[in-house]
Amino acid sequence: ALVEIKTPKSYSENARIGLRLFEAKCADCHGSNAVGQAGVAPPLIHIIYEPNHHGDESFQRAVALGVRAHHWKFGNMPAVAGLTRAEVKSIIAYVRELQRHNGIF
């Protein structure tokens, strides 16, 4: 873990769906609960990813197209196959609830 976080006692229904999808599709790189992994991928529970800097559409584009490294030195993120926009929206809901619970916004 690259950051220490607190997890909420409960999530909205959409965020619960997002949590399951995140653990299946994102956690291998970004770590369980989006805390990042040294040498692999950054934490998403970080001020860099707050909604005014990386809006929801930025997450949609990153999943669909991949993204060139620009804030961290982890290398480029590849596109993630097998997720619909609606599923990514649920993942975003999960990440945003974690961010909010940890004072990111």
Features from the language model and the residues they span:
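Electrostatic cytochrome c docking/interface patches
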Residues: A1-L21
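Gly/Gly-Pro-rich "capping" loops immediately C-terminal to redox-active cysteine motifs
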Residues: A15, L19, G31-A64, A79-G82
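The canonical Cys-X-X-Cys-His
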Residues: G18, F22-S32, M77, I91-V95
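Axial heme c-ligation environment in periplasmic c-type cytochrome domains
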Residues: A38-I45, L65-L98, G103-F105
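Short acidic/polar alpha-helix capping motifs at helix-coil junctions
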Residues: I5-S10, A24-C26, G39-P42
